[in-house]
């Protein structure tokens, strides 16, 4: 066997193997690599987009939280204002009611005072009439009259 012929055969076989690989094996491998490259690029773009969307979502979340805080503060301020108004209204109503009760009590006191005065006048006039009748029924005696007036003054006290 000739070494040159063997080398030439090997060269032809290598050329056929290279042609076969380039024609049938290499295109699917290149296609798979391109597909993987596209998928990796898409993944990287999606990751970048995800980071961007995450940053936007965090900013939006902070804005919503700030809006919620301001809304809560506004609601609390309104509730406080309303509570103060209710307290002021209740104070006003209570003062009006206290004034009415005071006026009613004053009127009742005046009415009771008038009643007691009238009753006292009636009692005094009855006692005076009794004293005068007692004085007129008996003879005029200074000592006796002094005793009667003393008893009369005792009955008044």
UniProtKB/Swiss-Prot annotation:
Biological function: F(1)F(0) ATP synthase produces ATP from ADP in the presence of a proton or sodium gradient. F-type ATPases consist of two structural domains, F(1) containing the extramembraneous catalytic core and F(0) containing the membrane proton channel, linked together by a central stalk and a peripheral stalk. During catalysis, ATP synthesis in the catalytic domain of F(1) is coupled via a rotary mechanism of the central stalk subunits to proton translocation.
Subunit structure: F-type ATPases have 2 components, F(1) - the catalytic core - and F(0) - the membrane proton channel. F(1) has five subunits: alpha(3), beta(3), gamma(1), delta(1), epsilon(1). F(0) has three main subunits: a(1), b(2) and c(10-14). The alpha and beta chains form an alternating ring which encloses part of the gamma chain. F(1) is attached to F(0) by a central stalk formed by the gamma and epsilon chains, while a peripheral stalk is formed by the delta and b chains.
Cellular compartment(s): Cell inner membrane
Gene3D superfamilies referenced in this protein's UniProt entry, alphabetically: 6.10.250.1580
Membrane association type: Single-pass membrane protein
Disulfide bonds: none
Pfam families in the record: ATP-synt_B
Keywords in alphabetical order: ATP synthesis, Cell inner membrane, Cell membrane, CF(0), Hydrogen ion transport, Ion transport, Membrane, Transmembrane, Transmembrane helix, Transport
SUPFAM superfamilies: F1F0 ATP synthase subunit B, membrane domain
GO MF annotation list: proton-transporting ATP synthase activity, rotational mechanism; proton-transporting ATPase activity, rotational mechanism
Family that this chain belongs to: Belongs to the ATPase B chain family.
Official protein name in the record: ATP synthase subunit b
NCBIfam families on file: ATP_synt_b (TIGR01144), PRK05759.1-2 (NF004411)
This protein's record includes keyword Signal: no
Keyword Transport: yes
Gene: atpF
Spans traversing the lipid bilayer: 11-31
């Amino acid at each position: 066997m000739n070494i040159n012929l063997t080398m030439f055969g090997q060269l032809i076989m290598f050329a056929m193997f290279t042609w076969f690989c380039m024609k049938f094996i290499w295109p699917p491998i290149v296609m798979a690599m391109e597909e993987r490259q596209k998928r990796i690029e898409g993944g990287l773009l999606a990751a970048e987009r995800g980071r961007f969307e995450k940053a936007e979502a965090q900013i939006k979340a902070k804005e919503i939280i700030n809006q919620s805080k301001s809304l809560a503060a506004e609601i609390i301020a309104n509730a406080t204002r309303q509570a103060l108004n209710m307290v002021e209204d209740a104070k006003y109503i209570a003062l009006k009611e206290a004034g009415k009760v005071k006026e009613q009590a004053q009127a009742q006191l005046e009415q009771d005072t008038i009643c007691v005065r009238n009753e006292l006048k009636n009692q005094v006039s009855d006692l005076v009439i009794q004293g005068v009748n007692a004085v007129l029924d008996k003879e005029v005696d200074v000592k006796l009259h002094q005793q009667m007036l003393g008893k009369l003054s005792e009955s008044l006290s």
